[in-house]
Regions:
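Cysteine endopeptidase catalytic domains of the caspase/legumain-like
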Residues: 4-298
């Protein structure tokens, strides 16, 4: 369920790294530009996109420093890496124009951003090798490969962008697409790509959003894995997107997202709750949500 609390702003930083070959260069740049358009459609968003000769470690450092200076604790950060990565068994590096940047350096940049809720989407080859360095409480990490040894070029980024543009990715019909919904959509489409090509899959996407532990392929039905990604809205669509652009409806949208967050929390707490109390709280929240949704649609 896509249920983030109301935020003053979202900071989207997208980087298309070094392609090495013209076809990769074109693909990475096009993917980054597609994301740029999607993110700029969000009201209250701050969008930074680095491609071509701008995709350097120095420029990325400058951008993240600016975000760290401007962002507040209640804001969200979404960092997306597109391109090639490498892993030598110890250290992951994201390939950029000029010096590469390591996962540890990327984590240090993100650590300086005060936004309490962060998402890093690493769509590169060998990206699984970056998870351990990037993970921390309050930060969800998605990687296109399950380990640093899956080193072939990936297609996950293509379907991640598609997920943020396809209303069918909004599985719970909340008119917002969560990081978990986008992950599941892109993972499914990636698997379908290899099946259609009759090729052995060389990438298996994973995520980690508890702040510690191993990356996983799927969240627990009732547990911590997947809770943050499910609650973190990447983009809004439909009525929710329109409401963000309508000052008169922003308070209603805030209430809607607050109720959705409560419902999501109840789902993860169900196993530890009295069944009667769970049913009562869930019913009340669902009725309130229906009322608010009706007001938004007027």
């Amino acid at each position: 369920m896509a249920v983030s609390p109301m935020r003053a702003s979202v900071y989207y930083v997208t980087v298309a790294g070094l392609g090495g070959e013209p076809d990769y260069e074109q693909r990475f740049t096009a993917t980054a530009k597609d994301l740029d358009k999607v993110f700029k459609a969000s009201s209250g968003a701050h969008v930074y996109t680095l491609t071509g000769n701008q995709a350097t470690r120095a420029r990325l450092t400058e951008t993240m420093t600016a975000v760290a200076r401007e962002a507040k604790a209640e804001d969200d950060l979404v960092l997306t890496l597109i391109g090639h990565g490498s892993f030598d068994g110890v250290e992951y590096k994201f390939n950029l124009v000029g010096p590469d940047v390591s996962a540890a350096e990327l984590a240090a940049m993100c650590d300086k951003v005060p936004a309490r809720r962060q998402l890093v989407v690493n769509t590169t080859s060998a990206s699984g090798g970056s998870v351990a360095a990037l993970e921390r409480p309050g930060r969800g990490v998605i990687a296109a490969t399950k380990t640093g040894t899956e080193k072939n070029a990936t297609v996950f980024a293509r379907y991640w962008v598609e997920a943020l543009q396809d209303p069918t990715a909004d599985v719970d019909k909340s008119e917002s697409i969560s990081a978990m919904e986008a992950f599941q959509y892109a993972d499914r489409k990636t698997a379908g790509f290899y099946e259609s090509q009759k090729r052995l899959a060389t990438e298996h996407a994973v995520f980690e959003d508890t702040g510690h532990g191993e990356a996983v392929r799927a969240g627990a039905a009732q547990g911590r894995e997947g809770a943050l990604l499910s609650s973190l809205t990447v983009v809004r669509i439909g009525v929710s997107q329109a409401a963000m652009n309508d000052p008169a409806k922003r308070d209603l949208l805030a209430k809607k997202e607050e109720l959705e967050q409560k419902i999501d929390a109840l789902k993860y707490q169900k196993a530890a709750m009295d069944p009667g109390d769970y049913k009562k709280q869930l019913t009340e929240a669902l009725l309130q949500l229906a009322t608010v949704q009706g007001e938004l649609e007027k």
